[in-house]
């Protein structure tokens, strides 16, 4: 018995030593090649998704003499979450996403986050509009299309909530035009597939916003990249993975990259580094060793959708219809029947169904999560896990789903759907932020966050939703934090040409909303509603499409222009 006790104690000691070695193992202990360039390049961008390419586009306009190098591990740009098939949701403008407008204990509706997201999306529209005018983006219908946004609920409590939500939001000029109905016939006119085959005794309600859009961020990323490549000061390196990041005494950076085809490594000397590598950003931030990286960990969650490509479905559903997450489910589980344009063709997606994976990227490694754990973040990760058991239970339940279970969820929103009509597709990975908050302690944070070092030489973007839809304003925030001197020295004036509302708030000015939306609607060929300057104006007039929009429209687009 004593021998067994000693053996058990020895095993425990070995496990503790192994755990300590694992948690304290240095991230950058190996030797790397010396930098091949004496004069540092101005900017290195890690990852060639919508975030990095948006930042590169800004910088090329603001500082065309800067040398910009982009390193991407895949063989093309926008291969991860920026790709249309991998993006969990597009055109996020808070018109329909109910998780952005929680009901407070006093029964009122919190609209602050929804208004902020709607404001941010207007900035995105201005940025894309400018790029169309400059010729960097081509025909608007290639990447953005009018697609009404709907919220759809059932049950007395949910119906009461949705009505209060609509009443709260339409007071803001950004949400003017949002309609509410409990009439099954009206809802069927908006979205036939939601209502056909539904129990006529079931009470339902919906909101309908004609100004919604669908956006293909893969197309935007590829077209902006092609525009960047026209400059001799821009270089894109595909099949190159960053393997080391080290700061020099002068605060510049040595970025070591591996050529995945040749198997060789090289090092680039850079003044500034942006880590825009999606889910991989956390590990690269940790690799940098900056003190700010110690406050973060990540929790990966994948997603799957049911995809409909048959014309009998896609021709009859031209809206994005968002529901309400089941009680106890996390915000990422909000179901939606979503009209998209992918590979130039209409598609309808239903989901998401969560997919647990330890990968930080769709094309990543199963070791990603474990290799991101260290002595700085293991405590917060365990505490967040303890406080979010509902999320753990939800993911376990999702892992047990079969096709029959998915079909059962689908018919709640598409009652006449047949199992043979859809195929299961896997979307991209998202890594939710686990953050050490100075006031709240460790928290699981939904959304995106910019992390910069105190010297303004490195920045990283962590997190997910609303993500790509607000990439232009997110990159504006990043530049304000990372390049404060340049912003004051002239960038801000130039930015007002790219984003006319820069430095001003749209959400408290109907006149400014009208001015900006007129501009972007004409360029992007999107519906437009005149917001009455009188706050007590009557019901909205019909949404109009500017005369500049001469493209052929399908029946749904014609209807929403009325």
Swiss-Prot record:
Asked if Flavoprotein is a keyword of the record, the answer is: yes
The protein, known as: Probable malate:quinone oxidoreductase
Gene name, per UniProt, is mqo
Q: Which organism is it from?
A: Stenotrophomonas maltophilia (strain K279a)
**What keywords were assigned to this record?**
FAD, Flavoprotein, Oxidoreductase, Tricarboxylic acid cycle
Q: In which pathway does it act?
A: Carbohydrate metabolism; tricarboxylic acid cycle; oxaloacetate from (S)-malate (quinone route): step 1/1
What catalytic activity is recorded? (S)-malate + a quinone = a quinol + oxaloacetate
Q: Where is the signal peptide?
A: none
Entry EC no(s): 1.1.5.4
**Pfam family of the protein (one):** Mqo
Which family would the database say this protein is a member of? Answer: Belongs to the MQO family.
Broad enzyme group: oxidoreductase
Cofactor(s) this protein requires: FAD
UniProt-listed HAMAP family: MQO (MF_00212)
Q: Name one GO biological process term.
A: tricarboxylic acid cycle
């Amino acid at each position: 018995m004593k021998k067994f006790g000693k053996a058990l104690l020895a095993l425990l000691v070995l496990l503790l030593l192994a755990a300590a070695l694992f948690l304290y193992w240095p991230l950058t202990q190996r030797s790397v090649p010396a930098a091949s360039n004496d004069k540092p390049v101005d900017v290195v961008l890690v990852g060639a998704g919508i975030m990095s390419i948006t930042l590169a586009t800004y910088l090329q306009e603001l500082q065309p003499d800067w040398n910009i190098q982009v390193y991407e591990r895949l063989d093309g740009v926008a291969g991860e979450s920026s790709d249309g098939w991998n993006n969990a949701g597009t055109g996020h403008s808070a018109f329909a996403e109910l998780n952005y407008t929680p009901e407070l204990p006093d029964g009122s509706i919190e609209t602050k986050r929804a208004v902020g997201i709607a404001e941010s999306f207007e900035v995105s529209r201005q940025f894309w509009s400018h790029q169309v005018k400059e010729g960097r983006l081509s025909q608007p219908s290639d990447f953005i299309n009018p697609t009404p946004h709907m919220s759809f609920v059932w049950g007395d409590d949910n119906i009461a909530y949705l009505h209060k939500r609509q009443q709260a939001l339409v007071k803001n000029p950004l949400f003017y035009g949002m309609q509410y109905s409990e009439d099954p016939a009206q809802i069927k006119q908006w979205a036939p597939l939601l209502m056909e085959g539904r129990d006529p005794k079931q009470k339902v309600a919906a909101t309908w916003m004609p100004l919604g859009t669908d956006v293909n961020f893969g197309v935007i990323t590829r077209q902006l990249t092609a525009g960047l490549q026209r400059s001799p000061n821009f270089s894109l390196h595909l099949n190159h993975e960053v393997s080391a990041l080290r700061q020099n005494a002068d605060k510049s950076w040595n970025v070591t990259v591996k050529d995945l085809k040749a198997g060789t490594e090289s090092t680039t000397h850079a003044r500034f580094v942006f880590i825009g590598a999606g889910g991989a950003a956390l590990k690269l931030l940790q690799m940098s060793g900056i003190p700010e990286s110690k406050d973060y960990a990540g929790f990966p969650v994948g997603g799957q959708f049911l995809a409909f490509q048959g014309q009998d479905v896609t021709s009859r559903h031209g809206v994005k219809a968002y529901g309400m997450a089941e009680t106890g489910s996390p915000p990422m589980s909000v179901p939606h029947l979503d009209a998209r344009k992918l590979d130039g063709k209409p598609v309808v997606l239903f989901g998401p169904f969560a997919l647990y994976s330890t990968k930080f990227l769709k094309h990543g490694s199963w070791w990603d999560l474990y290799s991101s754990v260290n002595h700085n973040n293991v405590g917060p990760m365990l505490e967040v896990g303890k406080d979010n058991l509902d999320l753990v239970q939800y993911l376990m339940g999702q892992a047990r789903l079969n096709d029959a279970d998915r079909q059962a969820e689908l018919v709640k929103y598409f009652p006449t759907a047949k199992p043979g009509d859809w195929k299961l597709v896997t979307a991209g990975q998202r890594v939710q932020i686990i953050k050490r908050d100075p006031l709240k302690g460790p928290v699981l944070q939904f959304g995106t966050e910019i992390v910069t070092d105190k010297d303004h030489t490195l920045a990283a973007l962590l997190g997910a939703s609303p993500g790509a839809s607000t990439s232009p304003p997110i990159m504006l925030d990043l530049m304000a934090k990372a390049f404060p001197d340049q912003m004051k020295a002239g960038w801000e004036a130039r930015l007002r040409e790219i984003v006319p509302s820069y430095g001003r708030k749209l959400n408290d000015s109907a006149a400014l909303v009208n001015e900006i939306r007129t501009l972007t609607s004409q360029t992007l060929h999107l519906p437009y509603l005149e917001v009455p300057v009188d706050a007590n104006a009557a019901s909205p007039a019909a949404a109009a499409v500017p005369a500049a929009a001469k493209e052929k429209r399908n029946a749904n687009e014609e209807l929403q222009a009325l």
